[in-house]
Design a protein with these regions (language model features):
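Short amphipathic secondary-structure patches
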Residues: 2, 57, 61-130
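Alpha-helical assembly-interface signal, strongest on the long, hydrophobic N-terminal helix that forms
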Residues: 2-88
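Low-complexity, S/T/G/P-rich flexible repeat/linker segments used as non-globular hinges
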Residues: 2-6, 132-159
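A short, hydrophobic/aromatic-rich structural module that often spans a beta strand
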Residues: 11, 112-124, 148-159
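Selective for proline/serine-rich intrinsically disordered segments
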Residues: 11, 32, 93, 132-138
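Intrinsically disordered, low-complexity segments enriched in proline/serine/threonine
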Residues: 13, 97, 139-142
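Extreme N-terminus of proteins, especially the signal/transit-peptide cleavage junction
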Residues: 17-20, 122, 145-147
């Protein structure tokens, strides 16, 4: 009798195989969610580091070009062709990079006091460039902490 009950209620091999596939599907659906959250977090971290490094590099590059090509010929600092080309390149490389050549590129003295463009002297004065770029995470959990604006200032002496 006992063997008869085992034989009658033994699941068929096809049923066992379907049950295993269903179990794998449930396990996959439970494991994919934390994996995707971690993956998106790593992508957000990479985007944040890229934006932060990009703003820093953009400020330095614009400053380097501006100290070599100081004015546009009419005495306006930061409006030379080379500087405007560099600004356009950096704006294309860093998403959302903001720089206003009129207010963000200034001539300063050794105490960081602003000097008028016409009074800017090579050898003793400096060029200061300030740039900023907004960053908003795309991962919902990370975006709960809000967005951030990366800012960078570079200062180099005019040769």
């Amino acid at each position: 009798m006992r063997n008869l009950v085992r034989t009658l209620f033994r699941p068929s091999p096809a049923f066992v195989e379907r049950a295993k596939r269903g179990q794998a599907l449930v396990e996959f659906s439970l494991a994919i969610i934390p994996f995707l959250v971690l993956l998106m977090g790593v992508i957000d971290l990479g985007r944040g580091i890229y934006t932060m490094n990009g703003t820093s590099e953009a400020a330095r590059e614009i400053t380097r070009v501006t100290i070599v090509h100081l004015t546009d010929g009419s005495g306006n600092i930061g409006f030379s062709t080379e500087t405007t080309d560099t600004i356009a390149t950096q704006v294309g490389l860093v998403p959302g990079l903001k720089i206003n050549a009129t207010t963000d590129i200034t001539c300063v003295d050794e105490y960081d006091a602003v000097v008028a463009d016409k009074d800017c002297r090579p050898g003793s004065d400096f060029i200061r460039v300030h740039v900023s770029a907004p960053f908003a995470p795309i991962t919902p959990i990370v975006s709960m902490f809000g967005s951030h604006t990366f800012e960078s200032t570079s200062r180099m002496q005019i040769p």
